[in-house]
């Protein structure tokens, strides 16, 4: 008898040996030992309190910036969805959003409430939880500019509130990445503005994204962080990797490729494995370093075991 046969009772769903590929935008990767879809915050807390503390736990959102390796993920993967997707305007140009709220939805709700400053979220294909953890940003703005506080839950099911200062935001990073905490919701603050003007700016961002990024492909968004003084897409492009296919097995062609539309977007053309995608990323990193002396660091989160 293993821990998987002795899981705590829940009101949500427990899926044993569940494939993770459908939970990510890349559509690759092996299974999780267990996927837990909590009904709400209390369901999540009760589960964590009762779960064997030796079992690893990882929370995910919509999997838009996530690469799951082909061997799958040990322990419990918590997928936050219903029960964590409410948005509430608080007054004083503040708005609260659950961790499972898509960033673009938060931007739209803020616009409707006349709160400016969150427009850039219209260009980020993730959720509030992920944006908080990685300090997501684009077009000159980032989460650190607008976040006031976040409520988080630890491995024991205990909840506490952290201020923006306590999150220690830096470029595409926060203290949450190393703390094993699950974001429940966050409060943001913007500036008062006319809803129509805000929506017009959001429309510009959405249009720009649609014409410059492969948003209809199986992708994980920006693959590499921008090194100081450089643009990752330009380094990848100048190294000759735009549109070039790759297979980890060494076969000609392959299903992994850096997008012809935007060379910092790694895409699965339909037949790639996680090993192909990660292998291409690491090959490009090594090639760029050899040619330019510039180190590219992954922005996409890679989890799990190789096959």
UniProtKB/Swiss-Prot annotation:
Active site residues per record: 172, 222, 299
Involved pathway(s): Cell wall biogenesis; peptidoglycan biosynthesis
Enzyme Commission code: 1.3.1.98
Every FAD-binding PCMH-type domain range: 27-193
Gene Ontology MF annotations: FAD binding; UDP-N-acetylmuramate dehydrogenase activity
One Pfam family from the record: MurB_C
Intracellular or extracellular location(s): Cytoplasm
Signal sequence segment: none
Alphabetized InterPro entries for the sequence: FAD-bd_PCMH, FAD-bd_PCMH-like_sf, FAD-bd_PCMH_sub1, FAD-bd_PCMH_sub2, MurB, MurB_C, MurB_C_sf, Oxid_FAD_bind_N
Entry-linked Gene3D superfamilies: 3.30.465.10, UDP-N-acetylenolpyruvoylglucosamine reductase, C-terminal domain (3.90.78.10), Uridine Diphospho-n-acetylenolpyruvylglucosamine Reductase, domain 2 (3.30.43.10)
Recorded coiled-coil stretches: none
GO cellular component: cytosol
Superkingdom of source: Bacteria
Keywords attached to this entry: Cell cycle, Cell division, Cell shape, Cell wall biogenesis/degradation, Cytoplasm, FAD, Flavoprotein, NADP, Oxidoreductase, Peptidoglycan synthesis
Family assignment from sequence similarity: Belongs to the MurB family.
Purpose: Cell wall formation.
Name of the protein in question: UDP-N-acetylenolpyruvoylglucosamine reductase
Organism for this UniProt entry: Caulobacter sp. (strain K31)
